[in-house]
From Swiss-Prot:
GO cellular component: extracellular region
Induction details: By injury to the larval cell wall.
Family: Belongs to the invertebrate defensin family. Type 1 subfamily.
Single GO biological process annotation from the record: defense response to bacterium
Native organism: Sarcophaga peregrina (Flesh fly)
Annotated protein name in UniProt: Sapecin-B
Length: 88
């Protein structure tokens, strides 16, 4: 009788663990999706920084590239509005 009780208890523990693992994987997938959404979201920058970017493009385009390289980006360009844009 003890053997059957132990076996039943072990079965319950394994099933609960499997359910918890499944829920953890689902939560991890949801978190990954949310992080990808946030990664793709546009980030608003302060007006002062935008003003600095415009001045960078109006003075010299190479300063825009230097600015972006220092931030870790590979390429840079100046938009029609003279705003420096950094691109991977």
């Amino acid at each position: 009788m003890k053997f059957l009780t132990s076996l039943l208890l072990l079965f319950v523990v394994v099933m609960v663990s499997a359910v918890n693992l499944s829920m953890a994987k689902e939560s991890a997938n949801q978190l990954t999706e949310r992080l990808q959404e946030l990664d793709g979201a546009a980030i608003q920058e302060p007006a002062e920084l935008n003003r600095h970017k415009r001045l960078t493009c109006e003075i010299d385009r190479s300063l825009c590239l230097l600015h972006c390289r220092l931030k870790g980006y590979l390429r840079a360009y100046c938009s029609q509005q003279k705003v420096c844009r950094c691109v991977q």
